[in-house]
UniProtKB/Swiss-Prot annotation:
This protein is involved in the repair of mismatches in DNA. It is possible that it carries out the mismatch recognition step. This protein has a weak ATPase activity. It comes from the Bacteria. Keywords: ATP-binding, DNA damage, DNA repair, DNA-binding, Nucleotide-binding. This is DNA mismatch repair protein MutS. The keyword Transmembrane helix does not apply.
Length: 862
């Protein structure tokens, strides 16, 4: 390293401690990156890669970004899963002897982002830790931006427990004590025993740690250790630990949550089109985040659910009160993240004004809540701290409209600090003297255009235009600067007054900063109060959101029962209904119980609504178990402990699993974990193998569920032979997605009714997909031949099917009617192009219906 310049040697010494991190190295007004960091960053950020002489034989790769624009570039690297270490100059270059001293002041990782501009308002930014100790795995998760911290412990290996951590949608994972690391694409860090004492929980949590088992303590420690090594400032805003039991909540694996599109769509990975999108009528950012958490963790406690439902009912029934409540909530800023920034030390004066304005809304908010006269809302209101002392303190200390920067002054209110007021007076008097000087010099010289100006280079000056220079009395001024159209002058008296003004302003700005930091530190002492208040406001915000959407969409309060009955009258898919016009949506009933109607065997053609019907029932269950009203005319529901879904086709290329293998693994998971209180949705099990293998597996799965588990199950299939189970297996009932043939065309009615379907209508669906006419008519010819030989798929032997196919294969191809070539319009071409690019494996029924509806509207405009 000796061949490098001292500055590059300094860079390499610092970089050695951050090998897996981009080092943003401050040089003047830029952050520079060198060597491999520069090469990779230039690609990731699409910035120019240059080089510089570093003292070695070759030029060093280098790229850089302006310091004032660095946040945008850092955010881009964080989005791509990278870490960034910010290395600042920690001494004044003018006073430095040799190389300016530099230190890493913070390490920013995807899971430790604190700045609002890097975060999404209504999404948490969690990081999670898994720690395996003494046969159990602790799972801890925290969001540094809000101060939340949760911990639990589960039996089993980390691979199976990983799903619990993934429910937080973490941006980073930390592992401790794992024999084998689970496969994940998330940025991960391994903490070893030399870095972590399992039993030495941070003093902030020491008291609570007494109630944690060693695996939970290890998980918390792993998180705290990682955060401590990356963040070099106070973490006092990190809330007291919330220990929970995962069994208190309705369990869904990652595939089920994804398949039901609870918080994002399968196709676009966006919020729009998900259940969260439909229900999110929250007015605050913290309410939006809490809504997401409630959706991802539905409750099992009937008492808690009834309390929530009663609050929703009260708010739904009083539109005027709810409107006032929403208006009041709209005045509340993101208290959780404001508290985080205040404690972290990066809040500015505007943040504190937002805090004050939010707190000023609390008394009115409490009054509206108390008016509902419901236990949940009254308890929330009674526990709300109005923080009047903080409001008064901030109102006395800070002006109403401070600047963004805390280094410009203009933040502290007159009367807060006596010495600051004196400096303000001195500054004002100095500027008054300047104005008087300007007027006096105009009168003395007779030059009306004379003016006194200021810039940061020359300070105060007297400016006279070239046309008036001859009128300047000799010896009156000292020339300072010549411009194209003017001359600038100074006088000893002006420079003396300038020194006084600038000294006062410099002292004033520095004192204002010190006073602001003191104000911020004083408010930081009350972080727990602010966090408790934020949590209560978020809860009422979610409850009013449920009431608002329930009122607008005509949802009803579900009746929660313990009998095992599950009856929905005129149920609707909440999201599909919202996308389609209300009057066009076809509602459907469902009736299930623990004995006679345990398994609904659903038959019918593709696109007839089977999958939508199944998802609809699961979503209604989730909505009821988060305390929301449901889309139905009437609903009597038993509480469900787990939901399993096997809907859609997807392979696992990374894991080396085929579509059929994934199907079998997910079905096995449901069969192993489900209980009599679970809800299972199985879509076309067995379709990925031969007909008879698939049919045998499907029947065996149904029998196992009926005889060994007893879970309520919806099972869709194209194996019409399975419909015979309704006559031989207690608890199995046939229902079908009704459709009609009219003039050779298939009409989907989207109505689920009792009984089995006679056909699957696959050729009709292929025709809708605009398969070539030759293929459609040839398929019809083959089907006719199969039906003539008795091979209709209604239970004939495999040999009959094989004979029929052999006969058809050896028969001459019948003449197929050729249709004349028709040229499509521009609209039709555009629709066909979309259709060709459509990935059917990742398209949900809701996506398909939305597409069909949009295409139909396009064609109607022709």
């Amino acid at each position: 390293m000796a061949q490098y310049t001292p500055m590059i040697q300094q860079y390499l010494a610092i970089k050695k401690d951050y090998p897996d991190t981009f080092l943003f190295f401050r040089l003047g007004d830029f952050y520079e990156l060198f060597f491999d960091d520069a090469i990779l960053a230039s690609r990731e950020l699409e910035i120019t890669l240059t080089g510089r002489d570093g003292g070695g034989s070759e030029r060093i790769p280098m790229c850089g970004v302006p310091h004032h624009a660095a946040d945008g570039y850092i955010a881009e690297l964080l989005k791509k899963g990278h870490k960034v270490a910010v290395c600042e100059q920690v001494e004044d270059p003018k006073e430095a002897k040799g190389v300016v001293r530099r230190e890493v002041t913070r390490v920013i990782t995807p899971g430790t982002m604190m700045e609002g501009k890097w975060l999404t308002d209504k999404e948490n930014n969690y990081m999670a830790a898994l720690a395996q100790v003494e046969g159990r795995t602790g799972v801890a998760a925290c969001d540094m931006s809000t101060g939340e911290m949760y911990v639990t412990s589960l039996a089993g290996q980390a691979e199976s427990v990983l799903d619990e951590a993934l429910q937080y949608r973490p941006k980073e994972l930390v592992f401790f004590g794992l024999a084998a690391l689970p496969k994940t694409a998330l940025p991960s860090t391994v903490v070893d025993a030399h870095q972590l004492d399992v039993f030495a929980v941070d003093s902030q949590y020491a008291e609570q740690a007494k109630g944690l088992d060693v695996s939970m303590r290890a998980a918390v420690n792993a998180l705290l250790f990682y955060i401590g090594t990356t963040q070099k400032r106070s973490l006092a805003h990190m809330r007291l630990l919330k220990q929970y039991d995962a069994k208190q909540y309705l369990q869904m694996d990652g595939f089920s949550r994804r398949n039901l599109e609870l918080t994002e769509t399968i196709r676009d990975k966006t919020k729009k089109g998900s259940l969260l999108w439909l229900l999110d009528r929250t007015q605050t950012a913290m309410g939006g985040r809490l809504l997401r958490r409630w959706i991802e963790r539905p409750l099992l406690s009937r008492d808690q659910l009834e309390a929530r439902l009663s609050a929703v009912e009260a708010l739904k029934g009083d539109m005027l009160l709810r409107s006032d409540l929403r208006t009041c909530l709209d005045r509340v800023y993101d208290l959780e993240r404001l508290a985080g920034r205040i404690s972290y030390g990066n809040a500015n004066a505007r943040d504190l004004i937002q805090l004050r304005m939010s707190l000023e809304a609390v008394p009115e908010l409490k009054q509206y809540m108390i008016q509902t006269n419901t236990p949940v809302l009254m308890e929330l209101a009674n526990g709300m701290d109005e923080c009047a002392d903080i409001v008064n303190y901030l109102a006395h200390a800070l002006v109403d409209d401070p600047p963004i920067s805390v280094r410009e002054g203009g933040m502290i209110r007159t009367g807060y600090d006596e010495y600051l007021d004196k400096l303000h007076t001195a500054s004002r008097e100095g500027k008054t003297w300047i104005a008087q000087l300007e007027q006096g010099e105009r009168e003395a010289t007779g030059i009306r255009s004379l003016k006194v100006g200021f810039n940061k280079v020359f300070g105060y000056y007297i400016e006279i235009s070239k046309s008036n220079i001859a009128n300047v009395p000799a010896g009156r001024y000292e020339r300072k600067q010549t411009l194209a159209n003017a001359e600038r002058y100074i006088t000893p008296e002006l420079k003396e007054r300038e020194a006084l003004i600038l000294e006062a302003e410099e002292k004033m700005i520095e004192l204002e900063y010190q006073l602001f930091v003191a104000v911020r530190s004083e408010v930081a002492k009350h972080i727990p109060r602010l966090q408790n208040l934020a949590e209560r406001i978020a809860s009422v915000d979610v409850l009013q959101a449920f009431a608002t959407v329930s009122d607008e969409r005509g949802f009803v309060r579900p009746e929660l029962v313990e009998s095992g009955d599950y009856v929905i009258t005129e149920g609707r898919h909440p999201v599909v209904e919202a996308v389609l016009e209300r009057e066009k949506y076809v509602a459907n009933d469902v009736e299930m119980d623990q004995t006679n109607r345990q398994v609904l065997l659903i038959t019918g053609p593709n696109m007839a609504g089977k999958s939508t019907y199944m998802r609809q029932i699961a979503l209604i269950t989730v909505m009821a178990q988060i305390g929301c009203f449901v889309p139905a005319k009437q609903a009597k529901l038993s509480i469900v402990d787990q939901i399993f879904t096997r809907i859609g086709a997807a392979d696992d290329l990374v894991g080396g699993h085929s579509t059929f293998m994934v199907e079998m693994l997910e079905t096995r998971h449901a069969l192993q974990k489900a209980t009599a209180k679970s809800l299972i949705l199985l879509d076309e099990i067995g379709r990925g193998t031969s007909t008879y293998d698939g049919m045998a597996l499907a029947q065996a799965v149904i029998e196992y569920i009926c005889q060994k588990i007893g879970a309520k199950t919806l099972f869709s299939t194209h194996y019409h032979e399975l419909t015979g189970l309704a006559e031989t297996l207690s608890g199995v009932v046939n229902v079908n997605a009704r459709c009609e043939e009219r003039e050779g065309k298939l009409l989907f009615l989207h109505k689920i009714e009792e009984g089995r379907a006679d056909k699957s209508y696959g050729i009709h669906v292929a025709e809708l997909a605009e398969m070539p006419t030759w293929v459609i008519e040839r398929a019809r010819s083959i089907l006719t031949g199969l039906e003539a030989n008795g091979s209709t798929g209604n239970g004939n032997a495999a040999s009959d099917v094989q004979m029929s196919l052999e006969t058809l294969w050896t028969a001459p191809v019948a003449a197929v009617r050729e249709e004349p070539m028709q040229f499509a319009s521009a609209e039709e071409e555009a629709i066909m192009a979309e259709l060709r690019e459509l990935d059917l494996n990742s398209t949900t029924p809701m996506d398909a219906m939305m597409k069909l509806y949009a295409w139909k509207q396009q064609l109607k405009k022709r």
